[in-house]
């Protein structure tokens, strides 16, 4: 047993910090900066983006985008949490933010680790390409991955080597009527639809 945990000076961390949901130091920095935040959260199924303004009574949501919208509103047939979906969700959120008068934000990636290739950076890249200013530095974006070319190449290789595994791994794509090898062209189609919609 850890004796320090029972000592008189032991301080229990806030519940959301214990649950791995909130970094209160980062939260404090955002609050005192008074800057609009571009909040990115990625779950096992979806990509969620919110543009929020700090307010003493609680955050004020200015705009948001959810990757589930890609399928419902724009006909996206791929996964809702892969790299292309992350970029598209960020792009959609960026357009909506600009539409509501937001031109610049700071990135809030929560407890996501800012490692090379992390999908949160593809979300941010999407918003930047939509016209939103987000100071982020070098985020090591690979343009091929934005369109899902890495997925298409893997699918093509797997299809020739193990058709059963191909059908299993890409069952959702196939059920929706998309051959994963065609993901890059499908990505371009959906991106154009988002651009045409204006957010």
From Swiss-Prot:
Keywords: Ribonucleoprotein, Ribosomal protein, RNA-binding, rRNA-binding. Gene3D superfamilies: 3.30.420.100. It comes from the Archaea. One of its GO terms (molecular function) is 5S rRNA binding. InterPro entries: Rbsml_uL18_euk. Pfam families: Ribosomal_L5e (PF17144). CDD domains: Ribosomal_L18_L5e. GO terms for cellular component: cytosolic large ribosomal subunit. GO terms for biological process: ribosomal large subunit assembly; translation. Belongs to the universal ribosomal protein uL18 family. This is one of the proteins that bind and probably mediate the attachment of the 5S RNA into the large ribosomal subunit, where it forms part of the central protuberance. PANTHER family: LARGE RIBOSOMAL SUBUNIT PROTEIN UL18, RIBOSOMAL PROTEIN L5-RELATED. Part of the 50S ribosomal subunit. Contacts the 5S and 23S rRNAs. This is Large ribosomal subunit protein uL18. It comes from Saccharolobus solfataricus (strain ATCC 35092 / DSM 1617 / JCM 11322 / P2). The gene is rpl18.
């Amino acid at each position: 047993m850890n004796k320090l945990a029972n000592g008189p000076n032991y301080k229990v961390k806030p519940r959301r910090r214990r649950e791995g949901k909130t970094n209160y130091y980062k939260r404090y920095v955002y609050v005192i900066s008074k800057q609009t935040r571009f909040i990115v959260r990625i779950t096992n199924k979806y990509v969620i983006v919110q543009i929020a303004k700090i307010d003493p009574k609680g955050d004020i949501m200015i705009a948001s985008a959810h990757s589930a919208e890609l399928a419902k509103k724009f006909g996206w047939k791929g996964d809702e949490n892969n790299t292309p979906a992350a970029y598209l969700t960020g792009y959609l959120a960026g357009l909506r933010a600009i539409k509501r008068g937001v031109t610049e934000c700071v990135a809030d990636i929560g407890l996501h680790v800012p490692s090379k290739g992390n999908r949160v950076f593809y979300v941010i890249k999407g918003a930047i390409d939509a016209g939103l200013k987000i100071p982020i530095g070098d985020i090591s974006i690979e343009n091929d991955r934005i369109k899902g070319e890495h997925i298409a190449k893997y699918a093509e290789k797997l299809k020739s080597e193990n058709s059963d595994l191909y059908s299993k791994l890409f069952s959702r794509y196939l059920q929706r009527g998309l051959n994963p090898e065609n993901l890059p062209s499908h990505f371009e189609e959906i991106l154009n639809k988002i651009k045409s919609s204006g957010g």
